[in-house]
Each structure stands twice: as C-alpha cells, then as structure tokens.
Amino acid sequence: MKYAIIEASGKQFWVEPGRFYDFNSLNVEPGDKIALTRVLLINDNGNITVGKPCLDNVKVEATVLGHLRGQKVTVYKMQPKKKTRKKQGHRTNLTRLLIDNIIN
C-alpha cells in the first residue's frame, strides 16, 4: 500500500492515491492539476522514508474536484448573572482534492 503524509493548509494529512480529501480553501480552479511538495513521509509498499522535515524530489499530484463549505460551527458565549449572551456561527470554505499519484 502506497501512502504519504503531507502538510497542506496548516495541517498534516495521510493521503493515498485514488481518494479525495478536503483542505482549507485553496486559490485554484476546479479541474486544475496541482502538485503538493511538502511531503513529510512516504511509504512505498513497506519502504518508509522520513524527511527532515520534508523530502526532496517527492511530490503528490492532485486534481481539484471543486469548492464546498464545511459543517456549521456554532459559538455561544455568555457571562453568568449578567444577561450577556452572544451566539455566532460560521462555515469554513473547503477545497476538495483527488489524489492522483505520489511521485518519488
């Protein structure tokens, strides 16, 4: 099984070819092909290589499937005995990527 651990949009993701993942909003168009170069670890059928912190000459190719919004997060703040209440909500903008290939 081939997989990689990459760093993208401030988080680390375990990615495998043929699967899609949701990243924080990226400034790309749907249908574009992009290369993710911050690869921290790669497993090529049992042969594990770890970077310090990143691997050189290794990249993950992905296709942008589209943009979407995450689930609504509700934030509720209140101060007891003061009648101060504040309710807010937001939805995070996401970009869905299909992992095509891991090139090492």
UniProtKB/Swiss-Prot annotation:
Give one GO molecular function term. structural constituent of ribosome
Q: Which domain of life is it from?
A: Eukaryota
**GO-annotated cellular components:** chloroplast; mitochondrial large ribosomal subunit
Record's keyword annotation contains Chloroplast: yes
Q: Which GO terms describe its biological process?
A: translation
Its primary localisation, in coarse terms, equals plastid
Which Pfam families does the entry link to?
A: Ribosomal_L21p
Q: Which UniProt keywords apply?
A: Chloroplast, Plastid, Ribonucleoprotein, Ribosomal protein, RNA-binding, rRNA-binding
Location in the cell reads: Plastid, Chloroplast
Signal peptide segment: none
- Function, as annotated: This protein binds to 23S rRNA.
Q: HAMAP family from the xrefs?
A: Ribosomal_bL21
Q: Which family is it part of?
A: Belongs to the bacterial ribosomal protein bL21 family.
Q: How does it assemble?
A: Part of the 50S ribosomal subunit.
State the name under which the record lists this protein. Answer: Large ribosomal subunit protein bL21c
Q: Which species is this record about?
A: Guillardia theta
Q: What gene name is given for the protein in this entry?
A: rpl21
